[in-house]
Structure formats: structure tokens, C-alpha cells
């Protein structure tokens, strides 16, 4: 389980910086951090710049977070995705559902 999740709450949004691998072992830790934030209905901006690996379990965490945030009236944006992660979201069709970007708009660096 090799993951680090840093959360910073700002006036307008919550910024989350994730580092490490998102897989079947680390996904529960990530979910545990994201669920309370999603339940707030806040605007979440998640920086994935330092994510070295993600499997389908990680996709599931982000889909669940997206659904919860939307239900509570907030938004979710994934930022600083590598080409590999963008491709993963693209081939699964999630790129058309979840707001993703290869660049940051002021997220945690």
C-alpha cells in the first residue's frame, strides 16, 4: 500500500494531492479520505501529478466520488494527469463524464 493523500481546504474548494500507486490495496485508503470530502458537496480538485500507477480499482474510486459529489451539489476535477492516465480515462469513456485535465488550475503542487 503505497499512497499519500494530502488535503487542503480553501475558501472556494478542496484541493487533494495524491502521490503513489492507486490499486486494489491502496484504493480503500483513498476512498476513506475522499468520501467525507465528497459528502460535503464541495468542489473537489484532485491533483494526480505524482500518481505512478492506477488500475481499474482506482477508476472505481473516482467514479464513486464523482457520483457522490454530484449528488451533494459539488463538482470534481482531476488535474495533472499523465498521458497514461488520460488514456485510461479515455478508453473507458470516463473522460467524457469526469472533468479531467493534463494541467493544473492552481491545484496542490
From Swiss-Prot:
Domain STAS intervals: 3-109
Pfam families assigned: STAS
Source taxon at top rank: Bacteria
Phosphoserine: residues carrying this PTM: 52, 56
InterPro entries: Anti-sigma_ant, STAS_dom, STAS_dom_sf
Matching PROSITE patterns: STAS
Listed transmembrane segments: none
PTM comment: Phosphorylated by RsbW on a serine residue. Dephosphorylated by RsbP or RsbU.
Gene3D superfamilies hit by this protein: STAS domain
One GO MF term attached to the UniProt entry: anti-sigma factor antagonist activity
Residue list for modification Phosphothreonine: 57
Keywords: Phosphoprotein
Role description: Positive regulator of sigma-B activity. Non-phosphorylated RsbV binds to RsbW, preventing its association with sigma-B. When phosphorylated, releases RsbW, which is then free to complex with and inactivate sigma-B.
Family: Belongs to the anti-sigma-factor antagonist family.
Quaternary structure note: Monomer. In stressed cells, forms a complex with RsbW. The predominant form of this complex has a stoichiometry of 2:2 (one dimer of RsbW is bound by two monomers of RsbV). Binds to RsbW in the presence of low levels of ATP or under conditions of energy or environmental stress (through dephosphorylation by RsbP or RsbU).
Stated name of the protein: Anti-sigma-B factor antagonist
The organism of origin for this protein: Bacillus subtilis (strain 168)
Protein encoded by which gene: rsbV
Amino acid at each position: 500500500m503505497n499512497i499519500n493523500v494530502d488535503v487542503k481546504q480553501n475558501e472556494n474548494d478542496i484541493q487533494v494531492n495524491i502521490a503513489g500507486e492507486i490499486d486494489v490495496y491502496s484504493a480503500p485508503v483513498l476512498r476513506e479520505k475522499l468520501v467525507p470530502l465528497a459528502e460535503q458537496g464541495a468542489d473537489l480538485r484532485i491533483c494526480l501529478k505524482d500518481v505512478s500507477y492506477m488500475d481499474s480499482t482506482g477508476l472505481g474510486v473516482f467514479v464513486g466520488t464523482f457520483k457522490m459529489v454530484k449528488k451533494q451539489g459539488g463538482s470534481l476535477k482531476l488535474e495533472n494527469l499523465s498521458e497514461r492516465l488520460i488514456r485510461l480515462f479515455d478508453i473507458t469513456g470516463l473522460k467524457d463524464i469526469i472533468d479531467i485535465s493534463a494541467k493544473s488550475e492552481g491545484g496542490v503542487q
